[in-house]
Amino acid sequence: VFSISRRQLSVIAAALALTACHSPVNEQPPAPELGSGYRTDLTAQHAERHMAAAANPLAAEAGREMLRQGGSAIDAAIAMQAVLTLVEPQSSGIGGGAFIMLWDGKSVHAYDGRETAPAGATERLFLKADGKPMAFPDAQVGGRSVGTPGVLRALEMAHKKTGQLQWAKLFEPAIRLSENGFAISARLHSLIAADRYIAQSPEMAAYFLNADGTPKATGTLLKNPALAEVFKRIAKEGPDALYHGSIAEEIASKVQRHRNAGSLSVADLKGYTAKERTPLCTDYQQWKVCGMPPPSSGGVAIAQILGTLQALQAQDPSLAIAAMQPVKSPSPAGLEPTPEAVHLLAEAGRLAFADRALYMADSDFIPVPVAGLVAPDYLAKRAALISERSMGIAKPGTPEGIQVAYAPDRSPLRISTSQVVAVDDQGGAVSMTTTVEAAFGSHVMVQGFLLNNQMTDFSFIPEEDGQRVANRVEPGKRPRSAMAPTLVFDRKSGELLATVGSPGGSQIIEYVSKSLVAMLDWKLDPQAAISLPNFGSRNGATELETGMFSPALKQALKDKGHMLSEIDMTSGIQAIVRTRDAQGKVSLSGGADPRREGEAVGD
């Protein structure tokens, strides 16, 4: 039974008042990762046996190589992650962390490989001497921002559950590419050219820049023998190769001796453990949607957005999102959502992000009211706040299960990360969102790979007006994330329908929500759903992908009271849909984001 004291109510009321009188953070966040232009030639890829999709074609092919050898979906994901460490170093790698959603054909598993704060971290980590928060670049670049990497431990845990191939085999494509070299892509070249901190790191400069300091050109063959040796050790010794011994010692030394030093130690690395969490599964129409629980906020926020849309339909059938089909558009996508659909998804997003800012953090440290936040009764009350006009800035609600009140977290919203999905011959599936946080992470390079700057995903400010922020820095804590690897099932049959996810910082929630509605409600194939223009709200302006929306749609939204912000929304959505026809034949269709370099491949 839900109960709350008078004192707790007064504290919560104060927090709500704080939120009402503050707008979201005004600090300009880092620019999004550059896209690759918008590819207009993509169509859904089809397969009968298995499929893999990743943000880089070399990674996708590594995944398919494992599937062709009888590997499971997690085998494919491990091979793809290893290759991404090499070919997409700005986005993810073995020096970072990941969340993994896994379907083994019988049950759903959620693996948390999120980085943790070192034992020496304090809540004043990102405060200057005067008590004010650091500027983001001052916090990001260097050892200060490095959390204990977790991706290899999470992959190890998942592999023990459903791996079919030997661990060592999964690193063969990455070792081969590291030794023989790969061609620098246009996107990687652009990101190198745009990053002014690479030149400050001797290791990064030697690897990414020419002798005269210019970025290596697109098409340059880039070899990484140091990383090949690391992969060989990991293949032979398992993740212990990274968390013990000489590699761990060098990681700790590089972090602690950097001019912007951090506290990550060998003991932190030795002590890291991945965690198997209880998946967050909620019903949406005739589907069951499963995502990550805290410390990711992505699963909760997406469940809230979908639940709010469902509640709106129950309250007024004319607001059924399924009836708001996209319309033809002269944009590169060829389609755009209707103003009504953008309005409803943006308003639902505002409500979800208001709750996210107040309640979401590492549930091992903070009592996050997850059940209350996704409860149908609560979402019905939240849906009732949506009208024909935009609410502007939403206030957080008061779900059941609140134990402690916190101040809202108004940290800048980051843009980063990578995504892989796979479905294997047995119908097993994986969705993994993986990251080093900002582009090129902390810019600390160790033996050919980059370390994360995941500590900057904590709130820089530990308290506000006497109230503590839930997502403040604490030793051993995992920072809040928006990563949202998602699996979708048919509620009646229990069969897997889709695996989907995206990079993009806090905008991941917008990207995945859009894709789910497009695939489930609007019946678009995965490629069309991914290619659909991005939009939404993170409880600020209504965000529209630059150059993708008609003047008529923008005016219609303005007429509803929306403040619009046209911005680059460089998602990297990957999705695979699995269907069975009347004769029982299974088929797969996959899509990759036209805004990046990825592809879906299968047999």
What are these regions (language model features)?
Residues 6-10:
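N-terminal export leaders
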Residues 19-20:
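C-terminal motif of bacterial Sec signal peptides marking the signal peptidase cleavage site
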Residues 276, 414-417, 481-483:
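Short, small/polar residue-rich loop motifs at catalytic or cofactor-binding pockets
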Residues 30, 315-435:
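Internal maturation/activation junctions in enzymes
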Residues 66-67, 153-161, 237-244, 249, ...:
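Alpha-helical support elements that line or immediately flank enzyme active sites
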Residues 86-93, 99-103, 107-110, 262-265, ...:
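Active-site rim segments in enzyme catalytic domains, especially the processed small/beta chain
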Residues 426, 476-478, 512, 521-569:
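Extended C-terminal subregions enriched in glycine
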Residues 24-61, 65, 73-238, 242-244, ...:
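Noncatalytic scaffold domains of N-terminal-nucleophile
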